[in-house]
């Protein structure tokens, strides 16, 4: 950080004794606002960077231009702009490494707060130190869409994904479907909770849960695996025994529909397909 003037200079500038200057610097150093380096002088710490409001809010999402994200970002921007704040956009592509890089960059800039969608939120976070540094620097943050397992006590805004997965599966069961396949994302909290809702609805409908009727995919294979797995089921392993598919989201549902149609099945006459979001 910026180097402070000498004790003599500060004493003359503020017309106080050197002893008073030393006491003031000691208090600031103790609070973490200053760092004294032997032989070099006293410097402002990173905390000083955030001591004055910048009216900048960082918004970190997994994606920017795909799927629902443009609408989410637009909604955030409308509220922030109305309150006199500017938005600083970052995206992680659901990568832990990129998330850590975004947080490091935020810590080096004048940012008043952070709205962040955690990457692969079902997996233990290994860069907790960066979130702790936000707190040390008095930068408030809120998690959206997901929450790391060890951060349940931090501010977060989540959908009720369990209830959503439950309701959509119950709807299919109530309409007579008995062979309901599920397609869920394994590395995000949303996918795990939607799957739990799916399981609960099957139990209540007295439909046996079959792990062979559940497709799990990850961020890296999200555009390939659901399509390939459903096509394999429709063409071989479950041919004639699949009457509905509960999908993690609408993007996944589009892949599932294409796979089923390429196997000669009609939607919804032969197989009902549900989306989410």
Language model feature labels by segment:
Residues 7-8, 96, 162:
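The beta1-alpha1 cofactor-binding region of Rossmann-like NAD(H)/NADP(H)-dependent oxidoreductases
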Residues 39, 92, 119, 146-147, ...:
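Short, ordered loop/turn segments at secondary-structure junctions
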Residues 48-54, 117-131, 218:
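Short, flexible, glycine-rich and Lys/Arg-enriched loop motifs at helix boundaries
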Residues 31, 78-86, 105-112, 125-277:
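Bacterial carbohydrate/catabolite-sensing allosteric modules
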């Amino acid at each position: 950080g910026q180097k402070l003037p000498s004790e003599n200079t500060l004493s003359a500038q503020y017309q106080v004794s050197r002893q008073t200057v030393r006491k003031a610097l000691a208090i600031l150093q103790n609070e973490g606002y200053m760092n004294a380096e032997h032989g070099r002088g006293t410097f402002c710490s990173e905390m000083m960077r955030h001591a004055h409001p910048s009216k900048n809010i960082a918004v970190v999402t997994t994606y920017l231009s795909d799927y629902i994200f443009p609408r989410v970002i637009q909604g955030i921007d409308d509220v922030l702009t109305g309150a006199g704040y500017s938005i600083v956009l970052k995206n992680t592509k659901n990568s832990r490494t990129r998330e850590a890089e975004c947080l490091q960059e935020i810590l080096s800039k004048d940012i008043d707060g952070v709205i962040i969608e955690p990457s692969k939120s079902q997996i233990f976070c290994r860069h907790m130190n960066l979130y702790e540094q936000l707190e040390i620097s008095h930068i408030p943050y809120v998690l959206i869409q997901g929450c790391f397992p060890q951060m349940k006590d931090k501010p977060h805004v989540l959908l009720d994904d369990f209830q959503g997965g439950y309701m959509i599966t119950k709807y299919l069961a109530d309409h007579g479907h008995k062979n309901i396949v599920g397609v869920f994302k394994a590395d995000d909290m949303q996918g795990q909770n939607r799957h739990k809702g799916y399981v609960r609805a099957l139990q209540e409908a007295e439909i046996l849960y079959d792990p062979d009727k559940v497709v799990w995919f990850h961020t890296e294979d999200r555009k390939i695996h659901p399509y390939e797995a459903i096509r394999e089921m429709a063409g071989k392993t479950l041919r004639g025994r699949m009457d509905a598919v509960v999908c993690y989201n609408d993007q996944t549902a589009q892949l599932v529909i294409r796979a089923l149609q390429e196997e000669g099945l009609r939607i919804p006459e032969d197989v009902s397909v549900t989306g989410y979001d």
